[in-house]
Swiss-Prot record:
E.C. number: 2.4.2.22
Subcellular location: Cytoplasm
InterPro entries, per the entry: PRibTrfase_dom, PRTase-like, Pur/Pyrimidine_PRTase, Xanthine_PRibTrfase
Protein encoded by which gene: xpt
Name of the protein in question: Xanthine phosphoribosyltransferase
Predominant subcellular localization, coarse grouping: cytoplasm
Any one GO MF annotation of this record: xanthine phosphoribosyltransferase activity
Sequence positions that bind 5-phospho-alpha-D-ribose 1-diphosphate: 128-132
Binding site for xanthine: 20, 27, 156
Example GO BP: xanthine metabolic process
Name of one Pfam family that matches: Pribosyltran
Amino acid sequence: MKLLEERIRKDGEVLDGDVLKINSFLNHQVDPELMMQVGEEFKRLFENEKITKVLTCEASGIAPGIMAAYQLGVPMVFARKKKPSTLNDAVYWADVFSYTKKVNNKICVEKKFLSSDDHLLIIDDFLAHGEAVKGMLNIAKQANAAVAGVGVVVAKEFQGGSDWVKEHGYRLEALARISNFENNQVHFVGEK
């Protein structure tokens, strides 16, 4: 998605050699117009898949997830990182390690929101090592839900998560595919 790549070049910041900070339009402040276009692109890519729900993870997956769900005309469910007191004990759990925050999280989804009747589209902001996506796939498996594919706003292709998703037989669509960072500059797959 050319518009997204341009925005990453303009406003993105490479930190510590392998972290991309895009807080000005996705991970802290959200650009709703850009997210609407992200949702439209996910719809274009997955509209023939008979999606029944979008599954994402709080917090930064919510903006692209809700826009994709809106465009597809289906509900969005987000995995919570902490079980609130209002959630009953009937939940699916998965362990997720955050490389950015260097912490282990348990994510959960209430069982009544996912079932074997569902055909899920998993959406997330980033795919690096793939831990969040692996956790959501684990939850989908516990629910016996089918997974139509995985859509990510940004894939850091050099960190292994993209390969893992594809090697495990899942369709992967990334709107911006980063091949590497060099001299604090972002390089996209396919660039010369």
